[in-house]
């Protein structure tokens, strides 16, 4: 297959020593399972390949997903998608206010419900001092958490007998459940594609 020729590696699992049997898992990991996300990843990888003046006989490796040249460009794209979505319902000031919250996570891309509440409390203190009209999405901690989940900015994590379950809104949404609810009192993680733009996490610890 042409895919296996250009991406001849197994995608590493983030939390175990095992690997997935296809590099395509890396693409899904960074995407929201939308075709345009996959095409954007391919476009950035191709652009970087050319900019690095690599030989035409070379192929891609898993390290290409960890290079700043990729993570910055792709993270900027994903954040732009969030901004475009919000622009239909909220002002640019609301968008900037949303981004302000992530400063209170102190660089952490993974956090507990208790840590989320602590960050939200500090976020509210900032709003009370600096914002005249508070947006509806940050009225309460749970409303704000649901808002982040609806935007696919965060997922909830639940431990199972096999391995952790990651609940994403885009996966949980179905014809019979068009407005899935985020799990409260769980653990949470910011989407991989947004970490760089939000200045969260150092890198992914592939084992």
What are the functions of these language-model segments?
Residues 2-207:
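C-terminal leucine-rich, beta-strand-based interaction scaffolds used for sensing/assembly
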């Amino acid at each position: 297959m042409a895919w296996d020729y250009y991406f001849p590696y197994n995608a590493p699992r983030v939390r175990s020593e095992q690997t997935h049997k296809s590099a395509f898992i890396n693409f899904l990991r960074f995407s929201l399972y939308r075709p345009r996300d996959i095409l954007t990843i391919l476009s950035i990888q191709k652009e970087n390949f050319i900019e690095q003046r690599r030989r035409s006989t070379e192929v891609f490796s898993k390290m290409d997903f960890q290079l700043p040249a990729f993570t910055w460009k792709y993270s900027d794209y994903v954040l732009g998608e969030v901004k475009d979505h919000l622009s239909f319902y909220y002002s640019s000031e609301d968008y900037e206010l949303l981004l302000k919250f992530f400063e209170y996570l102190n660089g952490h891309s993974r956090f507990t419900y208790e840590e989320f509440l602590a960050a939200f409390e500090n976020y509210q203190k900032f709003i009370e001092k600096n914002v005249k009209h508070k947006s509806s999405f940050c009225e309460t901690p749970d409303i704000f958490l649901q808002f982040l989940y609806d935007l696919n900015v965060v997922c909830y994590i639940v431990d199972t007998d096999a391995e952790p379950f990651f609940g994403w809104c885009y996966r949980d949404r179905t014809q019979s459940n068009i407005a899935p609810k985020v799990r409260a009192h769980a653990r949470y993680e910011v989407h991989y594609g947004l970490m760089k733009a939000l200045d969260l996490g150092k890198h992914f610890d592939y084992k």
